[in-house]
Regions:
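Bacterial Sec-dependent N-terminal signal peptides
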Residues: 1-23
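Aromatic-lined carbohydrate-recognition surfaces of secreted/lumenal glycan-active proteins
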Residues: 25-33, 81-85, 153-157, 192-241, ...
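Catalytic domains of carbohydrate-active enzymes, especially glycoside hydrolases
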Residues: 27-61, 65-68, 142-151, 252-257, ...
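The substrate-binding groove and active-site-proximal loops of carbohydrate-active enzymes
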Residues: 49-61, 117-135, 187-205, 230-232, ...
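Glycine-rich, aromatic-flanked loop segments that form ligand/cofactor-binding clefts
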Residues: 65-119, 151-161, 213, 217-228
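Active-site-adjacent "subsite" loops/lids of carbohydrate-active enzymes
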Residues: 82, 86-147, 181-199, 207
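Active-site-proximal loop/short-helix segments
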Residues: 154-190, 229-235
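Substrate-binding cleft/loops of secretory-pathway carbohydrate-active enzymes
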Residues: 206-280, 310-328
Length: 330
């Protein structure tokens, strides 16, 4: 998750969907890239997720506009989808005051030590304020829909458990609870209250952005579908990240998910029979299964992420072995 979006992400996604969904949506494979069409990345999936209005923070090329990147794939017969982060992304124009004349780097997630948690250079994990959500809707969602894209993926609604000390979080606390902020490390009750607010903030963020996307799309005669790419709750508990994932079934604006399971999540060591070690296949099986269970009562669409590499540098034998393990777990 933390560095998996390289210059070009060639992770192909296979989908498990109900029979009724298949009659409405024939997209079964898709992949993400922040780049324009190139022969080297044309893998003939059903669709492509063009990443970011401004690209991906890790992609330093940024030679073509979003509209030109969309056009290059559409000319090759691809169905075009859009993907960006809701907790981090290429949003420097917001943080540096180009959006409303005010700097917003103070809206990052901050630890007890006073350190901002960064996803990359000038890319903090965000406390999603109402102002930030307005920016996302006006600067990103509108532009994407204006370009004719009718499927939006807002990935990784994540609030780190160790965060919760920024001024922006304290303001959200006061608005939500009606009393002053309390440091989460001082009591179990404070920890609960802090986590509850973190959960709510990204639940609200997805609801507001997706509801806006659907309404704006409808005004232009489009039926916009909205998806949440997210890690499993198995992984979030291991990495100590708060996510509203368990409540997404209650949001009518959510049409489906991507199960972000790959070697990086599944090789996290865990305990069995008193022994702590990597169990990539077993963990991946639990991760995919826990996410597939989210669709049982709703019939929503679920894509399974499959990625041949991971965040950290390993040798290719290691990549291959664990890629095969996660793929088999599907």
């Amino acid at each position: 998750m933390k560095q998996k979006h390289f210059l070009i992400s060639l992770a192909v996604l296979a989908t498990g969907i109900s029979v009724s969904a298949q009659t409405k949506d024939n997209v079964k494979t898709t992949f993400q890239t922040s780049r324009e069409w190139k022969p080297s990345i044309d893998n003939r999936a059903d669709a492509v997720m063009v990443y970011g209005v401004g690209g991906n923070p890790s992609d330093k090329s940024r030679k073509l506009s979003f509209e030109d990147r969309v056009k290059s794939w559409k000319e090759r017969g691809y169905i075009i989808h859009f993907m960006t982060g809701i907790a981090w992304g290429e949003y420097q124009d917001y943080f540096t005051g180009q959006w409303d004349g005010k700097w917003h780097l103070d809206e990052g997630q901050v630890t007890q030590a006073g350190d901002t948690i960064w996803h990359g250079h000038m890319v903090p994990y965000i406390v999603p304020s109402e102002n930030f959500l307005s920016y996302l809707k006006e600067r990103h969602v509108k532009r994407v829909i204006d370009a004719g894209v009718d499927a939006i993926f807002m990935e990784e609604p994540e609030f780190w458990a160790r965060a919760g000390y920024s001024e922006s979080f304290k303001k959200e606390w006061k608005k939500y609870y009606g009393f002053d902020w309390r440091p989460q490390h001082e009591s179990p009750e404070n920890t609960y209250l802090s986590s509850k607010l973190k959960y709510y903030l990204y639940y609200r963020a997805l609801n507001e952005v997706f509801t806006f996307a659907k309404e704006y799309g409808k005004s232009k005669g489009m039926d916009v579908k909205c998806y949440v790419p997210t890690h499993s709750l198995v992984n979030y508990s291991q990495w100590q990240i708060v996510s509203p994932e368990a409540s997404l079934a209650s949001l009518p604006c959510v049409d489906g998910y991507i199960a972000q399971v790959w070697t990086g999540t599944s090789r996290e060591p865990n305990f069995f029979d008193g022994r702590k070690r990597e169990r990539v296949f077993e963990t991946a099986y639990l991760e995919y299964g826990s996410m597939e269970s989210m669709t049982a009562p709703t019939g929503r669409k679920m894509f399974f992420l499959t990625d041949p590499i991971e965040d950290w540098p390993r040798d290719w034998a290691d990549y291959k072995k664990n890629y095969q393990a996660t793929f088999t777990a599907q």
